[in-house]
Amino acid sequence: MEIRVVDHPLVSSRLTIMRDKRSTNDVFRAALSDLGMMLVYEASRDLSVDTFPVSTPVDQADGFRLTEPPIIVPIIRAGLGMVDPALSMIPDAQVGFIGLARDETTHKPVPYLEALPDDLSGRPVFLVDPMLATGGSLLHAIRLLASRGADDITCICMVAAEPGVQALKAADLPVTRLVTATIDPSLNEDAYIVPGLGDAGDRLYGPRNIDL
């Protein structure tokens, strides 16, 4: 699995805004949207393209389009914040959904939604979730995708924790690459990333007050 940490001043500035506990929900959302576009741009670097002739107002030129646009799969809830940024970069991408909540006692993922194409064979998949902490949610989602034939999965996360990265590397699953803005060193006793940025879902949308 390739691990790609995007080193860029604009990436760092948006990540700083997201980390800052003073950032309000709207400021956090705006920074996440900007950072999401940057990470999707980087994740798309290896997508295959077809060439075709295009007529400019002056002459002919070579045109380029994606051979197979990826399917964007957010892990709900926080992953929803990355859908619009991804679609702004790849407007012809299809979107699937995986809903997972975190059991605050066990820190294990609790699935509650799955809306995916039946056959993902041969299709690039961008699995998006702002946070990679223990890796439990991401691994659960990857197994769902693999069960439908996905064999080219790119995980796009804003912040990854070293324990989650190691869990992803150790899993025998079809993960091609991880694209992230940073790898933080550890998790606390509540399995939150340290230093991290808190609960991305809460900072996007407010506290979740429904037990699943």
Swiss-Prot record:
PANTHER family reported in the protein's UniProt record: ADENINE PHOSPHORIBOSYLTRANSFERASE, URACIL PHOSPHORIBOSYLTRANSFERASE, CHLOROPLASTIC
The protein's annotated pathway: Pyrimidine metabolism; UMP biosynthesis via salvage pathway; UMP from uracil: step 1/1
Organism: Corynebacterium kroppenstedtii (strain DSM 44385 / JCM 11950 / CIP 105744 / CCUG 35717)
Nucleotide-binding recorded as keyword: yes
Keyword hit for rRNA processing: no
A GO molecular-function annotation: uracil phosphoribosyltransferase activity
Binding site for 5-phospho-alpha-D-ribose 1-diphosphate: 77, 102, 129-137, 199
Cofactor or coenzyme needed: Mg(2+)
Name the record gives this protein: Uracil phosphoribosyltransferase
Binding residues for uracil: 193, 198-200
Signal peptide: none
A Pfam family matched in the record: UPRTase
A GO BP annotation: UMP salvage
Record family assignment: Belongs to the UPRTase family.
Cofactor mode of binding and number, as noted: Binds 1 Mg(2+) ion per subunit. The magnesium is bound as Mg-PRPP.
Annotated function: Catalyzes the conversion of uracil and 5-phospho-alpha-D-ribose 1-diphosphate (PRPP) to UMP and diphosphate.
Annotated catalysed reactions: UMP + diphosphate = 5-phospho-alpha-D-ribose 1-diphosphate + uracil
EC code(s) of this entry: 2.4.2.9
Entries under HAMAP family matching the protein: Upp_B
Keywords, ordered alphabetically: Allosteric enzyme, Glycosyltransferase, GTP-binding, Magnesium, Nucleotide-binding, Transferase
CDD domains, A to Z: PRTases_typeI
Activity regulation, free text: Allosterically activated by GTP.
